[in-house]
Amino acid sequence: MSKSRRVFLSMQDDDDFWGNGDRFEEEKSCLAAKAKQRSCPVVEMEEDDEEMEEKYFFKQSHLVRQRLEQMKEREKVDEEKEGVERREENGFSGKPWKFRVDSDEHEMKSDDVVTEDRSIMGTKTFNSDFDDKSAIKSSLSMSLESNDVFYANYRNFFRGRPEVHFLIRCLFEKNPETFDNQFIDLYEKTRKRLEMYPNPHINQILRRTLSSSNATETRVRSKHAVVVSNFREPDRRLGRYSKYYYHHNVGPEVYSRKVFVGGLPACVTEDDILGFFSRYGRLQVDWPSKHYGGSKSDSDPSLCSEIITPPAPLSHLSMASPPFGQINPFMSGYVAPAETRGGFLRASGFSEGGGFGGGFGGGIGGGGGFNSGSGSGNGTKSDGSTSEKRQSHLGYVFLLFEKERSVRDLVAECFEEEEGLFITLESSLEPIRVQIRPWLLADAEFLMDFNVPINTKLVAFIGGVPRPLKAVELAHFFEQTYGNVVCVGIDIDNKFKYPRGSGRVAFSNYDAYVQAITDRYIVLDHEDIHKRVEIKPYFFHNQSCEECSGRYHRQHAPFFCPSLECFQYYCEPCWHKMHAHPSRFHHMPVVKGV
């Protein structure tokens, strides 16, 4: 997709973005109503007056600028003439200079005797001439300085905003390519038109943030840490309209169907969460260690009708936790099989009754064990059992919606604060304010420059990326540390398109790539994020060996040597061949998937 196409698509609103045509029909009806109103002569007169007023305003502003330029040129000519006169006077003797001084004194004395009527008619003294010239110079300098500051602020504002160029090219055929005064006047004229005929979506793009463009960022750079104290956060809801977002999501979805909800107290139960958020659509609540202590349930709500038969356990690891995809949380009343539910308990000496079994011979309560309840021998019904502890959330949950439209409805009802998006959860006890953190799909990719090609040999893998971190923020960190960043991507899962905790960074400079791989770790320190991430070479699924180019049985390269002596990908035969020498025997490989 071309650059202009992406920028054009980024200007579309949500309804046009989904392509349902409702927004277009509303706009057509609005345009028809406006056309009927314009047929009225009174409205035409008002519009003519507005257009005349606008033309007069721009004409007057243009005349003022021309007048300032003419006054500046005249001032230069006067200064040159005064310099020539001074040089000529310095070349003569002292008598002419004395004569001029005497004449000036005589004029000043005569001016003191002049009446007020004569002064009103236009006679001016030497002092008044000097004061007028100084006042004109001061006012001219102030106006010129303000004019220069005006253009300088606009030039700083235009940096990194290609949507401004595209918008003005769409409105006008002839426009300059550089940020000169004519371009800025054209932009100001467009902005005035949009103020007279408002368009909320275009006005969102053309927001004037001149004050923020002059703000300086305090950066502290070290070898393994980046601290940015004044990083400008993009808008959470209108990320596509921000200056940091040039990527357009190709597809109908805008948000991930998986939403993070934080700030939940222990008194809020799963039923309370389901009862409140079910108004937005069908969903399921999930959190880590909800099922069998550690296995995450990321099943799709659309698969709730499927019956999954678990395979027989093959080892003690499969007894401890079922295989991936075995549990479907959307199946009501799902109970794990007996061999899976009790295999680990029997192997570790526990019995399903709740107490210690064979290992201790029932010496510690064979029937009730450690149960603090009624002592009935059923661990699932007791208050202190492990199954009850697993069912309580950890202060946060994930909402797994069936449709993406539900997430957009949820975000629309949230209120925004400095920390993020919040909503008031109506529980059985009292209303609770909880944080809603949706994932915008456009945040998963960020391009620094469209014109720079991506070299696949200069791509680094970033492990341990915090899930709230966006691609633009990750690009900002690496740009401040190493520089020459071309593209940054956040890895997302295929089912919910939610971040997986890793990312990719593509460099345009070999030295920057080598420095990043050599450092191996970097600490991301920004606001509430403080985490050390790992930097490794990126392994593609068909990564070829750089030593033999896949000649050995067409094997891929699962090894990478980070030593500067090698610093390339190897297949297994080439690794043993190249590192058999004693000088390279101590090299430690970076293995794919480890």
From Swiss-Prot:
Function: Cytoplasmic polyadenylation element binding protein that binds to and regulates the translation of specific mRNAs.
Region (Disordered) location: 72-91, 367-388
Ranges of biased composition (kind: Basic and acidic residues): 72-90
Cystine connections: none
Alphabetized Pfam families for the sequence: CEBP_ZZ, RRM_7
Gene: cpb-2
One of the record's GO cellular component terms: cytoplasm
Organism listed in the record: Caenorhabditis japonica
Keyword set includes Phosphoprotein: no
Biased composition (Gly residues): 367-378
Protein name as annotated: Cytoplasmic polyadenylation element-binding protein 2
Keywords (A to Z) from UniProt: RNA-binding
Domain of life: Eukaryota
GO terms for biological process, alphabetical: negative regulation of cytoplasmic translation
Gene3D superfamilies the UniProt entry points to: 3.30.70.330, Cytoplasmic polyadenylation element-binding protein, ZZ domain
Boundaries of every RRM domain copy: 458-540
